């Protein structure tokens, strides 16, 4: 089969950043705001390990899948790159890698979808990707974590002369606990 990305650029997966002016930041540092997951024993998790173990084997198995996790910040960079370290990749025959292992980028208070950081097909332990904008402008960025993969580290790459600021918090700061199936999550609807 020929490389369809040579015919249609929408099929191209950028895995070599080639960014001379990139500066990477660890999302555990200020000014990043993390929601929906927290860091424990080397992984981002949806709930503490001990609680997950005490609920059921199924909850234990899925508690380090990062569905619902997101990081927010404000920048004027003309691109946002990621470097994700992922010790477990959720590859399934009925589910695309963009959902199970990709990160989605949204812009603005209403979090309008821009594009997905698409993992390469041969992903084994993480990937790098970049999303470019047409111009330099102040943007509130939200990056959603993958649905069915584990993430041990995430670094955000921006132009080294771009500013990086804390994003405004959510209007309602109290967490909402919502339980549902994979259909509710959007995984297998």
Predicted regions and their residues:
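N-terminal secretory targeting modules
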Residues: 1-175
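Catalytic nucleophile-elbow at a beta strand-turn-alpha helix junction centered on a G-D-S/GDSL motif
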Residues: 173-189
């Amino acid at each position: 089969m020929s490389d369809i990305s040579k015919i249609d650029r929408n099929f191209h997966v950028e895995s070599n950043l080639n960014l001379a002016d990139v500066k990477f930041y660890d999302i555990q540092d200020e000014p990043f705001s993390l929601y929906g997951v927290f860091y424990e024993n080397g992984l981002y998790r949806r709930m503490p390990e001990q609680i997950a173990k005490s609920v059921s084997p199924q909850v234990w198995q899925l508690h380090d899948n990062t569905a619902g996790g997101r990081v927010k910040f404000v920048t004027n960079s003309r691109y946002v790159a990621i470097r994700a370290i992922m010790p477990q990749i959720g590859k399934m025959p009925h589910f695309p890698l963009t959902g199970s292992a990709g990160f989605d980028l949204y812009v603005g208070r209403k979090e309008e979808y821009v594009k997905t950081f698409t993992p390469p097909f041969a992903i084994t332990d993480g990937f790098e990707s970049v999303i470019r904008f047409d111009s330099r402008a102040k943007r509130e960025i939200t990056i959603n974590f993958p649905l069915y993969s584990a993430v041990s580290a995430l670094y955000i790459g921006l132009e080294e002369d771009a500013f990086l600021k804390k994003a405004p918090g959510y209007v309602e700061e109290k967490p909402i606990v919502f339980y549902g199936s994979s259909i509710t999550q959007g995984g297998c609807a």
